[in-house]
Amino acid sequence: MVRVKFTAFLVCLLALSCTPKDRYVVFSGYAQGGTYSVKFNMNGRDGMISQDLQEIKDSVDAILTAIDASLSGYNKNSILSRFNAGETVVPDSYFIDIYRSAYDVYNSTGAVVDAASAPLFDVWGFGFKSGEMPSSDKVMEVMSGCGMNRLQADVTMAVSGDGTLNPYDLLRDRNGVPPQLNYNAIAQGYSCDKVARYLYSIGVKDMMVDIGEIFCDGVNPKGMPWGIGIDKPVDGNNDMGAQLQAIFKVPAGPHGVVTSGNYRKFYVKDGRKYAHTIDPRNGYPVSHNLLSATIVAPDALIADAYATYCMVIGLEESVSFIESTPGVEGCLVYDDGGEFKTWTSQGMTLSEL
């Protein structure tokens, strides 16, 4: 699913530490077309973290740079961009790893979150290429070349002995249209998880990683759960945190937190609003009263995927999905006769503003 990523606004500011030994630090930088920030406690699982702050920041920057070089659809020299252009590429560990995750997400969401629908996103103007208002015939034509079900489940089976991957070799039917992939629905969540995994590896236990999506664990500097604000889904609300719908505390333990919505990327044609959330099952932008979906899940990639999933299937199905999925909590903001209303799952406590 192509969509704009909404940073769940960090409400809790770094303040006094929990204990005399705690030392919370923060650094930020640029990645994946935007900014990122990492906040964590230098007092880790086994005492003070041995690496200095600059070394940690350099390692995080290296991870994000490597992911961008592999998976960015906007970087024309990335492995993904060259693959989508029909070139034979040498897939790295990130390319292989996220492909496997995307295939799992495709299956778990019943083909709703489909990384192999990149041409469909492009034709509507919400992908890596410009486009606007395709004809129904064009939509059907483009859909015939989409779908993870056309591709092998294990990308490594398509990699040649010399380590290269030809796009045609990924097809189940090699005579089909070569695939094009778009990981916008999971890439930033995936990046959060990768950075968090690195922080765990050096002993960090209390952290907040924000790369347009959020991963957090442990507690904030006050010894309390991390506080997250949910933006009010007002068209054109691009100033994150300026207009909040509600605030909630993230449950204890490691969690990804992702908000998806249709209020920051859309266009209007002949008086009708076309949102950037596309349903790959029919090829058209969704039209329903669900304005935003905030998902809390065990990791950021899954939260990312499920937030997109909810924005496709709408309010009623999203409620059923969240209530029936173990380890997942959610907050849905919807339009009820011109008023913003919220629904929250049982394990998610909100303070509405």
Where are these regions (language model features)?
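Mature catalytic core of soluble alpha/beta enzymes
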Residues: 2-7, 17-353
